[in-house]
Amino acid sequence: MPIQINKTVIFLMGPTASGKTNLAIKLSQQFKTRLISVDSALIYKGMNIGTAKPDKATLKKYPHYLINICSPESSYSVFDFIRDANKQIKTAFAKNELPILVGGTSFYFHVLEHGLSNLPESSTKSKEKFNQLLRNKGTIKLHQDLKKIDPQAANKIHPNDSQRIIRALEVFNLSGKTISELQGNKKPIIDYPIKKIILMPKRNELHTKIETRFLLMMKNGFLNEVQHLKQNPNLHQNLSSIRCVGYRQAWQYLNGKIDKTEMIEKIIIATRQLCKRQITWLKSEKYALVLNNSNLAKAVTFINS
C-alpha cells in the first residue's frame, strides 16, 4: 500500500459511538500516519472509562496525540487546541506521515477549516480570574451577566456551557468589545488540502450502541473513576471536565442528588442528544466521503485519490 506523501490533512469525523477510533487504527495499518485526537474530553488525564478513551495497550501500539495532555482542573481553550493541532500536523509532514485528525468535537474541526474570529488571546492570569468568578457566582449567574453585556452571544450559548460563557466575558474584559462584535474576518487555520471522511451509521444502531457501551462502562468501574476524581479538592461540577457527558450526572449521583437508575437514564439520554447534535452538524459538511460503517477499502481509495 503506498504511503500518502502529499501534504493533505484527513478529517475522520462521526457522532459518538460510530467507530471512528476503530477506522483510524485500520488506516494506521495501511499508511504511515499520525493520529491526532479532536476530542475535548479525551484531553483529560484520569478520565478514561467515561470518555471511551482507547486503552493503554491500544495507545501504546497506535499513539494518539492530544490525549491525556492536561489535568481535569486545567482550562484548555480552542486556542490551545489550534496551537497543539498545528504543531502535530507540521510534525507529521516533517516525518512524512499522514495526519489523521479523528474525533467528535465539531467546533474544533470547524475552527481548523474555517478559522476563528480575531479574538484576544487568553492568559493564565485571566483564566484564573474567570475560573474563580465561575466558582463564586456559578454558571447561571454568569450567563445572566453575559446577557446584559452581549445578548446576542448569550442567546447562542447554553446557560450551562460554562467554558463558552466565561470566554465571552473574558473577551469583553480584555478588549472592551463583545465577542459578537469581534466575530467575523476569519481565515482558515490549516493551509493544506483537507479530505473528510464521515462515519454515519443508522441512528437506531447508534442508540443501541450508546446504551450497550455505557452499561459496559459501568461494569468496568466508571463510578469508581468518578469517585476518585471527587477526591481531588480542586475539582467541582462547574469545570468543563466534570461537565462532560456522563461525569456531570455521575457527580450528581455521588452527591446524592439523583438515584442510580435516574443517573443511568440521564447519561444515556444526554449521550443520545449529543449524538443528535453531532449528526446535525455533520449533515452540513460538504465534499466528504460518508460511510455507514468502517469501510476500510473505500476510505483507503478516497485518501489515495
Curated annotation (Swiss-Prot):
Site location (Interaction with substrate tRNA)? T105
The record's GO molecular-function terms, alphabetically, read: ATP binding; tRNA dimethylallyltransferase activity
This entry's Enzyme Commission designation comes to 2.5.1.75
Q: List the disulfide bonds.
A: none
Alphabetically list the UniProt keywords. Answer: ATP-binding, Magnesium, Nucleotide-binding, Transferase, tRNA processing
Catalytic reaction equation(s): adenosine(37) in tRNA + dimethylallyl diphosphate = N(6)-dimethylallyladenosine(37) in tRNA + diphosphate
Assembly with partners or alone: Monomer.
Q: What is this protein called?
A: tRNA dimethylallyltransferase
Q: Which organism is it from?
A: Vesicomyosocius okutanii subsp. Calyptogena okutanii (strain HA)
